[in-house]
From Swiss-Prot:
Entry-linked NCBIfam families: PRK04949.1 (NF003433)
Main location: membrane
Disulfide bond positions: none
Gene behind the chain: cysZ
Name the record gives this protein: Sulfate transporter CysZ
Annotated localization: Cell inner membrane
Single Gene Ontology BP annotation: cysteine biosynthetic process
Function in brief: High affinity, high specificity proton-dependent sulfate transporter, which mediates sulfate uptake. Provides the sulfur source for the cysteine synthesis pathway.
């Protein structure tokens, strides 16, 4: 077994291999399609509204400011690009939460050798929605006060020198929580017990959270890395819990 902090890349690599397998592909493609349709729709709506706003604004400006129409649109495109980049992961995780819990459950079925082609059930998926969304709100409640505290810290001269590394460490820790919580929640482990278990596996958790954090920073690639992280986190759960002695692949 590799050193604890170095096991993260292995889990993510195996998770990616799992979600690309024929038996699990459907559980990945459906939430990806929903997220892509949603974002395309939001971008189209924003572009349409912005176009109406520009058309209404430009006639009221002096003629010598007409060049602004050529400046405003590129700025809008850049703004939308930044918004998509920074909001996609957060919004996609909330939308995909029931799918991710469902995917984690099916990955565990495959990993334990119960069924290489687990069946897809809409009824089973819908039944998971209230629980998984409540858990996402719990994560948000954990994240926000700490993020606000770090933001305030970053505004204090001199002290803010430690804010950047703390932000990075907190982001890595949140990635571990975000994804390992799916299999933990499937096994009805309480929020506090899950956090306590991750602290016991601190270095393994940070290693996994770190590689996921880096992978999700890559535009477009992060779309596939989210389900891969769910599968990798499920492998993390099964192996680190020691319920079964599953060999590394």
């Amino acid at each position: 077994m590799p050193a604890p902090v170095l096991s993260g890349p292995q889990y993510l690599r195996e998770g990616l291999k799992l979600v690309l397998s024929p038996g699990l592909r459907l559980f990945v493609l459906l939430p990806l399609a929903i997220n892509l349709v949603l974002f395309v729709g939001l971008i189209y709506f924003a572009g349409h509204q912005f176009s109406l706003w520009v058309d209404a604004l430009m006639p009221s400006l002096p003629s010598w400011l007409s060049f602004l129409s050529y400046v405003i649109w590129p700025l809008f495109v850049v703004l939308v690009a930044f918004m998509v980049f920074f909001s996609f992961t957060m919004l996609a995780n909330i939308i995909a939460a029931p799918f991710n819990g469902f995917l984690s459950e099916k990955v565990e079925t495959v990993v334990r050798g119960t069924d290489d082609f687990p069946p897809f059930s809409w009824g089973e998926l819908i039944a998971m929605i209230p629980r998984t969304l409540a858990r996402e709100m719990r994560k948000l409640g954990y994240f926000l006060p700490r993020a606000i505290g770090l933001f305030i810290l970053s505004l204090i001269p001199v002290v803010n020198l430690i804010a950047a590394p703390l932000w990075l460490l907190f982001g890595i820790w949140m990635m571990a929580i975000q994804y390992i919580d799916y299999p933990a929640d499937n096994h009805k482990m309480s929020w506090q017990d899950m956090l306590a278990w991750l602290r016991q596996k601190r270095w393994q958790s940070l290693g996994f959270g770190g590689i996921v954090y880096l992978a999700l920073l890559i535009p477009l690639v992060n779309i596939l890395m989210m389900p891969a992280a769910v599968a990798g986190a499920t492998l993390f759960w099964v192996r680190e819990r020691g319920v079964e002695n599953l060999p590394a692949k």
